[in-house]
Design a protein with these regions (language model features):
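Non-catalytic cap/lid and distal C-terminal segments of serine-dependent acyl enzymes
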Residues: 1-210
Length: 210
């Protein structure tokens, strides 16, 4: 039972939480369900900070690390200091996806929150981290309580864009499925293949068109 949320989601106590995920939770999930080993972790606010810390301390546990409005300001920008310690390190083609709500939305601590996000974005833009792909997305019409809803949907559209194939394009060029999945595999450094059900449904649709 989680008895101390701040301990489990902030860097000082977060290590044991991710160790539990790696050693106990993930193996249990994989026994219960059919899973690919392409893994995504998503967090918001304080748990967004936890997702960022997972990238820093368990950078092979997941393939994509998603943080919606992460509390990078926590404990005097402690996460930013951890990033500074990792300058030059190889992140093995991991993807860091950060969304944040609009600058116009103000509340206590909001300016400090935006400043830390800008610092991290500047570090990634300079290429301080080897093989770390990053994407920062602002949602000006959202606030801290809603950004994760839009951000999660947009995440799927952006990260897996190659999977969204118009059937009219398939009719014109059946090879587009193979081409798109190969492009997705190159982008995310993981071998993706279309599911059997997708191929069967598409083949039945194509037969009806003929």
């Amino acid at each position: 039972r989680n008895t101390d949320r701040e301990r489990d989601l902030t860097p000082e106590g977060n290590g044991r939480f991710w160790q539990f995920v790696a050693d106990e939770l993930r193996p249990w999930v994989e026994k219960q369900y059919r899973c690919a080993d392409f893994r995504i972790v998503v967090g918001h606010s304080l748990s967004g900070l936890a997702a960022v810390n997972a990238l820093l301390t368990h950078s092979t546990l997941f393939n994509v690390y998603v943080a919606h409005d992460p509390s990078l300001w926590w404990n005097d920008n402690y996460a930013i200091e951890l990033f500074k310690q990792r300058k030059g390190d190889d992140f093995q083609h991991r993807l860091l996806y950060i969304s944040h709500s609009g600058y116009k939305v103000r509340h206590n601590g909001r300016s400090r929150h935006i400043e830390t996000l800008n610092k991290l974005q500047a570090m990634t833009a300079k290429g301080d981290f080897k093989n770390l792909n990053s994407l920062f997305v602002e949602y000006p019409d959202e606030n801290h309580g809603t950004v994760q809803v839009v951000g999660n949907l947009d995440l799927l559209r952006r990260v897996f864009a190659e999977m969204f194939i118009d059937r009219n394009d398939i009719e014109e060029n059946p090879q587009i499925i193979k081409q798109r999945y190969e492009a997705l595999s190159r982008k995310l450094h993981y071998h993706f293949t279309p599911s059997e059900s997708y191929l069967k449904n598409t083949a039945r649709w194509a037969a009806r068109q003929a």
